[in-house]
């Protein structure tokens, strides 16, 4: 008789994804982050669910309901800070996962890559709306500033902003709808992640060399299940260390002040994982131009497969492109730092140069490096 895990309709799906999946024998730890993202998502949904049981999406009580969770609910403080810092860990994993895809040329799996870009955008939207919910100063002003950017859209901009706000300013209607969206989106992310995985399993995983690995595949279990468990242990260690020793390390002190529409905080800035995009937005003096640059800074990922000029898939054997890749990482770190600084000299010019370099590296320098490397190989 066939093993139940291979014959049962539901077990078969899990078996083909986690047990008998043929995986390349040489994938490194950079391939761990997909499973870590899955763990992050489950963790965020669970902690979020328990938070939603005690949270009230109302301008008068939202702030105090979060305080109540931290003070009066059993282990509420742990759930709240695991959820807040879980988002940071989620984005660290996301950025590494995308970076891995860029470095090793995984973007040639078009469907998988494009769904990944949609997943990134959806996760960013979810995180933004979640940041508004505690209804502190940075929540309120962050929501005001970011939603206001839509008013730069010609003709329909102002109507669009008022439609999203549900009034003429960020108020009760805005908070209620943001809570509704923040609750539903993670489940949409889960469905998209399943499709992401479905398309990946159509082609099989890429590997560090970028060379087809059909000649040398190994079963996912036990080799990569045990490797993933190690990754999860390290991830949980990081998350718990952050939550228990420095829960407010990545947060903004302004968010411990209840939202006040009459007093603007000195420096409005988003959470650290949006700072790179925020720096690009601020580096352009024109409102519409800034919004376009902000959107393009993420959507440019969808163009990457079209900008691939090299005859090799991975950067493993391409030192010139490797240098440019690490320059891009350094540039993104610079943008992240600039996004958290006030708008004054010398930060303005540094931000503008870093923004230009970001687009220049992706759109011009890396494709040109690919062509040069092709020539060098022929020569």
From Swiss-Prot:
One of its GO terms (molecular function) is ubiquinol-cytochrome-c reductase activity. Its cofactor is heme b. GO terms for cellular component: mitochondrial inner membrane; respiratory chain complex III. Heme b b566 binds at residues 97, 196. It is found in: Mitochondrion inner membrane. PROSITE patterns: CYTB_CTER (PS51003), CYTB_NTER (PS51002). Belongs to the cytochrome b family. This is Cytochrome b. Binds 2 heme b groups non-covalently. PANTHER family: CYTOCHROME B. The cytochrome bc1 complex contains 11 subunits: 3 respiratory subunits (MT-CYB, CYC1 and UQCRFS1), 2 core proteins (UQCRC1 and UQCRC2) and 6 low-molecular weight proteins (UQCRH/QCR6, UQCRB/QCR7, UQCRQ/QCR8, UQCR10/QCR9, UQCR11/QCR10 and a cleavage product of UQCRFS1). This cytochrome bc1 complex then forms a dimer. Component of the ubiquinol-cytochrome c reductase complex (complex III or cytochrome b-c1 complex) that is part of the mitochondrial respiratory chain. The b-c1 complex mediates electron transfer from ubiquinol to cytochrome c. Contributes to the generation of a proton gradient across the mitochondrial membrane that is then used for ATP synthesis. CDD domains: cytochrome_b_C, Cytochrome_b_N. Disulfide bonds: none annotated. It comes from the Eukaryota. Keywords: Electron transport, Heme, Iron, Membrane, Metal-binding, Mitochondrion, Mitochondrion inner membrane, Respiratory chain, Transmembrane, Transmembrane helix, Transport, Ubiquinone. Pfam families: Cytochrom_B_C (PF00032), Cytochrome_B (PF00033). Heme b b562 binds at residues 83, 182.
